[in-house]
UniProtKB/Swiss-Prot annotation:
It comes from Vibrio parahaemolyticus serotype O3:K6 (strain RIMD 2210633). It is a multi-pass membrane protein. Keywords: Cell inner membrane, Cell membrane, Membrane, Transmembrane, Transmembrane helix. It comes from the Bacteria. The chain crosses the membrane at residues 30-50, 58-78, 107-127. This is Fumarate reductase subunit C. One of its GO terms (molecular function) is succinate dehydrogenase activity. Belongs to the FrdC family. InterPro entries: Fumarate_red_C, SQR/QFR_C/D. Pfam families: Fumarate_red_C (PF02300).
Length: 127
């Protein structure tokens, strides 16, 4: 064994701020934070639904709070942003071929958004 100390390069905690790719990545991954709050709000709402009408009305009043509405809007925008980045990566990760020819990337992305719109419409009709 050697007594020599190996060189360990110092890495600052904010190293990712200097690279646009990593800033974008961190922003995309940070979209989960408002979604966590949204999920907690809904879970709390389910608990209130089980407790009875008074608890349910209290939860509805809580959800009408402007801060909660703002958090929900940020969560929606974050999930749409995350979906957009995911959909734009999909043609690169899994190229699709029809009759031996590659399908245009824009068509793949637009098809995914059309599926989201269709499913959202079905959910709105059913609920």
């Amino acid at each position: 064994m050697s007594n020599r100390k190996p060189y360990v390069r110092e890495v600052k905690r904010t190293w990712w701020k200097n690279h646009p790719f990593y800033r974008f990545y961190m922003l995309r991954e940070a979209t989960v934070l408002p979604l966590i709050l949204f999920t907690l709000f809904l879970t709390f709402g389910l608990g209130c639904l089980v407790k009875g009408p008074e608890a349910w009305q209290g939860w509805l009043a809580f959800m009408a709070n402007p801060i909660v509405v703002a958090i929900n809007i940020v969560a929606l925008l974050g999930s749409l942003f995350h979906a957009q980045t995911f959909f734009s990566m999909m043609p690169q990760v899994m190229p699709i071929r029809l009759k031996g020819k590659p399908v245009d990337k824009k068509i793949i992305v637009l098809t995914q958004w059309a599926a989201v719109a269709f499913i959202s419409l079905i959910v709105l009709i059913v609920v």
